[in-house]
Amino acid sequence: MYTSVLLNVESTILDFWRLLKPRIMYLVVFTAVAGMVTAPGSMHPFLALISLICVALGSGSAGAINMWYDRDIDLLMERTKNRPIPSGRVSAESALEFGITLGILSVFIMAIAVNYISAALLAVSILFYVFIYTIWLKRRTPQNIVIGGAAGAFPPMIGWAAVTNSVSWESFILFLVIFMWTPPHFWALSLNKSEDYAKASIPMSNIVYGPEKTRKYILIYSVLLVLTSLLPALFLKKALLYLSMATFEGCVFIWYAVSVMKFKNHSSQKKMFSYSISYLFSLFASIIFCSIDLF
């Protein structure tokens, strides 16, 4: 009996954890770290930790509210039908309350403990993801990912603002890198999940314009991404080293995009999607490494 109760509690905790979309949250926090490290000045380690926790909670808040709103279409898609809400393991009301609570807490703590600018940016990123992307764009236009991608591009700006109490062109460049990365990343996924998106009536690019045009868009955005990814060299301490690292990582990205156009199959699209995640981690790791003095 006692073991059964413990298992139920553990299962519930895991389901609420899944509402936060942890894989996205890890990436969000990592890019926020890049913003903090590249920013001029310094920050007390404890406040830096508080800032990152707030970013994580804010990201999780947006994820939970997104799952609450999308519970109807999640039920229709193979990829999402086993999520906590459509599977019935977490009630829609509980998920919404959980998401709103986390969002309010994250912004409030950021404002009180860190500064108002970083808190405002965090609030904008949450609201943009929920209202602009989830509620307005996702079900209405194939530009959903293009415009909606801005929501996930805020973390480096938030990290920068946490340190400097300001927004600058440098942090906006980091924003642009993620903004340009988002479309090819999600289009590679959507090409392999066309039936799911069609069943849920989500107007992804490949559903509206067809797979051929979408593959061309992937290549175009990949080239634009790689060009944008070179811009941080303008303010990083090890500019030449960063340029070489970003160029290599970017060439591999374009190679995968070309493979998607050339082979037009599930395998090439899956590899493109997988590499795009590794690419963003690697690129921002390069940004972090090239902004600190180790030798």
Curated annotation (Swiss-Prot):
Record's keyword annotation contains Transmembrane: yes
Pfam families (UniProt xref): UbiA
Segments traversing the membrane: 24-44, 45-65, 94-114, 117-137, 144-164, 171-191, 216-236, 240-260, 272-292
Enzyme class: transferase
Stored InterPro entries: Protohaem_IX_farnesylTrfase, UbiA_prenyltransferase, UbiA_prenylTrfase_CS, UbiA_sf
Higher taxonomy: Bacteria, Pseudomonadati, Pseudomonadota, Alphaproteobacteria, Rickettsiales
Catalytic activity: heme b + (2E,6E)-farnesyl diphosphate + H2O = Fe(II)-heme o + diphosphate
The species this protein was found in: Wolbachia pipientis wMel
Gene Ontology BP, a term: heme O biosynthetic process
Principal place of residence: membrane
Membrane topology, as annotated: Multi-pass membrane protein
EC number(s) given by UniProt: 2.5.1.141
Family recorded in the similarity comment: Belongs to the UbiA prenyltransferase family. Protoheme IX farnesyltransferase subfamily.
Pathway the protein contributes to: Porphyrin-containing compound metabolism; heme O biosynthesis; heme O from protoheme: step 1/1
Gene Ontology molecular function: any one: protoheme IX farnesyltransferase activity
Protein name: Protoheme IX farnesyltransferase
